[in-house]
């Protein structure tokens, strides 16, 4: 309630980039409070529903953006990712959610008390083609953190990648889907290696402390 109806006084660097591309901003979409969770159930607006099945969540924290794109209301929506907030909603809603390299798009103005900015600014769309077109355009916008331009992506790259496949703790259906995707990539000549990444609950506790500090 403390931030209900709060209107930003200025555009972030990334929003300025978006406006410079000519995209039209239709408004805000729902997120969980301060983007802290992987589902979108804001206390003010109530839970956001998955367009494919209203009994399910669209994921989070960019769940409102993903729901708008998946339902066809918009073709592209802003999302950002510090711990899955682009990738989780994209997965839940059957969308393309690419977490770009930090600095590929403009970094937002973070909290002054935090020494690092862990957010990656991006979008969710319904196709790889739309996502590629967005990044081709956005990388031409002014950005003091800009990386060397990639340009228009019209075909698969020739380089073969080394890809680690991690399915620790995954639901069986999710694990099978990931393994199927890995098989497809292996068929394209990429090297796939299944690995295990031990995860300590302390990591999650530390992350929530960091993220909560960023919120203020």
Model-identified regions with their sequence ranges:
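Charged, often glycine-rich, active-site loop that binds/positions anionic groups
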Residues: 42, 46, 205-216
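N-terminal, positively charged, Ser/Thr/Ala/Gly-biased leader segments
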Residues: 1-6
């Amino acid at each position: 309630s403390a931030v209900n109806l709060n209107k930003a006084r200025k555009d972030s660097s990334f929003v300025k980039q978006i406006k410079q591309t000519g995209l039209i901003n239709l408004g805000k979409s729902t997120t969980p409070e301060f983007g802290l969770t992987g589902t979108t159930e804001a206390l003010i607006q109530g839970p956001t529903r998955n367009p494919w099945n209203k009994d399910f969540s669209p994921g989070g924290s960019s769940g409102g953006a993903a729901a708008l794109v998946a339902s066809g209301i918009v073709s592209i929506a802003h999302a950002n990712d510090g711990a899955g907030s682009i990738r989780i909603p994209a997965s839940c809603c059957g969308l393309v959610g690419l977490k770009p390299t930090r600095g590929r798009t403009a970094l937002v103005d973070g909290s002054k008390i935090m020494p690092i900015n862990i957010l990656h600014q991006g979008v969710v769309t319904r196709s790889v083609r739309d996502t590629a077109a967005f990044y081709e355009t956005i990388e031409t916008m002014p950005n003091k953190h800009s990386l060397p331009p990639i340009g228009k992506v019209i075909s698969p790259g020739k380089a073969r990648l080394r890809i680690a496949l991690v399915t620790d703790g995954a639901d069986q259906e999710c694990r099978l889907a990931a393994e199927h995707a890995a098989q497809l990539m292996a068929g394209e000549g990429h090297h796939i290696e299944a690995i295990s990444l031990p995860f300590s609950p302390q990591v999650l506790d530390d992350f929530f402390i960091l993220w909560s500090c960023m919120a203020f």
